[in-house]
Structure formats: structure tokens, C-alpha cells
Regions:
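N-terminal hydrophobic targeting signals that begin at the initiator methionine
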Residues: 1-2, 24
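Sec/Tat signal peptide C-region and signal peptidase I cleavage site
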Residues: 16-20
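Short, functional N-terminal and low-complexity linear motifs
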Residues: 3, 62-67, 107-111
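A short, solvent-exposed beta-edge/loop patch
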Residues: 21-33, 74-90, 99-149
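Intrinsically disordered, low-complexity regions enriched in Ser/Pro/Gly/Gln/His and often acidic
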Residues: 66-68, 97, 121
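Primarily extracytoplasmic ectodomains and periplasmic/lumenal surface modules that are beta-strand-rich
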Residues: 92-94
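Secretory pathway targeting signatures of secreted, lumenal, and periplasmic proteins
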Residues: 38-80
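Sec-dependent N-terminal signal peptides
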Residues: 4-14
Length: 149
């Protein structure tokens, strides 16, 4: 029984490491971040909805399923600030319309008040919470496009 529990514990640690590796692979590294930007601890989400979704994802888990892992990168420069939210779900994400409605409301697209852009692929959701024109957002989008083909 003791060996079985050790085996199960090892599997859980291994699977948690694999999940975090997926997000780590698509996050911007310090070498990829332009010099004028710095990583910060403070959230720079542009809308309350994006911030709430990241901080309390279990609030909506009955709709979109359980989250395996989540991470956020917060950036600021003299000209720009924003956050990239990374959410990884246990199963393929099938609630894209719900997330769009939650973030954008009736417009179903980015607005001045809710400028976030949303990317969904399999079980991963990425939300860029920046103003519409952002060098860092475009850099991240290109990396994710390459990494998640």
C-alpha cells in the first residue's frame, strides 16, 4: 500500500510538472521581453472581468470545467502596461463563447473598455489584457502562434 501511494504521488508530481511546462513554454522569457518593459507583481488587467476570471476561475468552473493550472505575466513600461493570462484546463475548452461574453459583453469583440484579446486552442486559453496597440502583446501572440501550431 505504501509503495502504491508513493507511485500515485510521483505520478501527480510528474503530471503537475508537465502541465506547468506547457505554460512555461509559451510565456515570454526575460530575454524575449523588450528592454523598455519590466515584469511586475501587480496585475495590469484592463478590465474587471479579466481580473475576476483569473483570480476566481472556480466561480465559473461549472460552465467551462476544471482548471489544471493558471499563470499571469504582468508588464509595464513608460508607454504601455498589461497582463497575459494563461489558463490550462483538464479537458479541451469548449466555452469560448461564454468567455467572450464574460469579457466583452454584448459586443462579442474587444472594445475600448474591454480591449482584451482571447486565444483558445485545445485545453488552453490565453487572454491578452493590453490596450489595442501593444508591442508586447504582438510579440506574445507571435510566440504563441509558433509554439502552439
Amino acid at each position: 500500500m505504501k509503495n502504491y501511494l508513493l507511485f500515485i504521488g510521483s505520478l501527480l508530481m510528474f503530471s503537475m510538472n508537465i502541465f506547468s511546462q506547457k505554460i512555461e513554454k509559451i510565456k515570454l522569457t526575460t530575454l524575449e521581453i523588450p528592454k523598455e518593459y519590466k515584469l511586475t507583481e501587480n496585475s495590469h488587467c484592463k478590465s474587471i472581468q479579466a481580473n475576476l476570471l483569473f483570480k476566481n476561475p472556480e466561480m465559473y468552473q461549472m460552465i467551462y470545467g476544471k482548471i489544471k493550472s493558471k499563470e499571469i505575466q504582468n508588464f509595464e513600461s513608460s508607454q504601455d502596461s498589461g497582463s497575459i493570462l494563461y489558463l490550462e484546463f483538464e479537458k479541451d475548452f469548449e466555452s469560448e463563447n461564454f468567455i467572450k461574453g464574460l469579457i466583452w459583453g454584448k459586443s462579442k469583440k474587444p472594445t475600448d473598455g474591454n480591449p482584451e484579446e482571447i486565444f483558445v486552442k485545445k485545453n488552453t486559453v490565453i487572454i491578452w489584457s493590453f490596450e489595442k496597440e501593444s508591442v508586447l502583446k504582438e510579440l506574445s501572440k507571435k510566440k504563441i502562434e509558433l509554439e502552439m501550431k
